């Protein structure tokens, strides 16, 4: 950080010479009252960050439209979650760094407790079970679950999966809903992420995918051979996740900046960009 210093100009040439001599000898001048605040008093000073000056965020990638690999982005990633986090980071005077992480290790809190990142931004639903291990930000997105099938599969609802194979992502609320609601003779298969789920249905390894509606919608838009046949209102809200009891100041700072993004319209602009 550069600190501007003001040197008084003396009335005589001799005094000017003395002033120049003092500067050249390295004697520090007192900072002026208009100098910027030091790092110790900056908004990010007490956030206990993994790396100073950086907001380190763990996310399970890909999970479009929330987390997307993007070589054109400074962080290497884009998507709704990532861009919201970038907005938060900028408001805190920080640089965003994104680490690709397994979702199950995020929702269990394992990666967060290990202090590998400051928080998780990964389309994570706030649940009472997860609250036992992690702290959440204020909700930032309302979501539905959905069922994606191949257009010519003949499957029109969850009941139509009797005797068939249903793909879900491990550790998700989609898996929980499938376990409770799918036909008893449906085979439910876990996958690490959407990066494996989507190729699996394309290859005919599974008959359907049950997961968050925005993600399945991305697939039906990308390939007209697939469609969402049902959505399920499970009253889910997403939150950003923090190590339990360890990042309270950061949690508050993120909540404050989310409110600021709503107030200045930047959140709404991102929402419109990704969800219309």
Language-model features, listed with the residues they occupy:
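Sec-dependent bacterial lipoprotein signal peptides
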Residues: 1-21
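Periplasmic-binding protein-like
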Residues: 141-149, 217-259
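Bacterial lipoprotein signal-peptidase II cleavage site
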Residues: 20-37
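Extracytoplasmic small-molecule ligand-binding "clamshell" domains
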Residues: 42-122
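A ligand-binding cleft/hinge motif common to bilobed small-molecule-binding domains
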Residues: 123-132, 179-180, 203, 207-234
């Amino acid at each position: 950080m550069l600190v501007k210093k003001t040197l008084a100009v003396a009335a005589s040439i001799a005094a000017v010479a003395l002033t120049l001599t003092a500067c050249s000898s390295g004697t520090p001048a007192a900072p002026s009252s208009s100098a910027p605040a030091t790092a110790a008093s900056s908004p990010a000073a007490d956030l206990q960050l993994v790396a100073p000056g950086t907001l380190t965020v763990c996310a399970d990638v890909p999970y479009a439209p929330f987390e997307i690999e993007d070589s054109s982005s400074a962080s290497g990633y884009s998507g709704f979650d990532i861009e919201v986090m970038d907005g938060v980071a900028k408001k805190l005077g920080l640089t965003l760094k994104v680490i690709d992480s397994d979702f199950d290790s995020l929702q269990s809190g394992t990666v967060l407790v290990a202090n590998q990142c400051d928080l998780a931004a990964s389309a994570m639903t706030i649940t009472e079970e997860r609250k036992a291990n992690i702290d959440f930000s204020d909700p930032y997105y309302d979501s539905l679950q959905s069922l994606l099938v191949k257009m010519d599969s003949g499957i029109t609802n969850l009941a139509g999966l009797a005797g068939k194979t249903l793909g879900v992502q491990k550790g998700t609320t989609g898996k929980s809903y499938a376990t409770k609601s799918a036909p008893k003779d449906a085979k439910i298969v876990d996958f690490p992420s959407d990066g494996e789920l989507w190729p699996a249905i394309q290859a005919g390894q599974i008959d359907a995918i049950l997961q968050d509606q925005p993600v399945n919608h991305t697939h039906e838009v990308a390939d007209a051979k697939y469609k969402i046949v049902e959505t399920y209102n499970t009253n889910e809200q997403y939150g950003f996740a923090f190590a339990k009891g360890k990042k309270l100041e950061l949690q508050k700072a993120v909540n404050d900046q989310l409110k600021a993004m709503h107030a200045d319209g930047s959140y709404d602009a991102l929402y419109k960009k990704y969800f219309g």
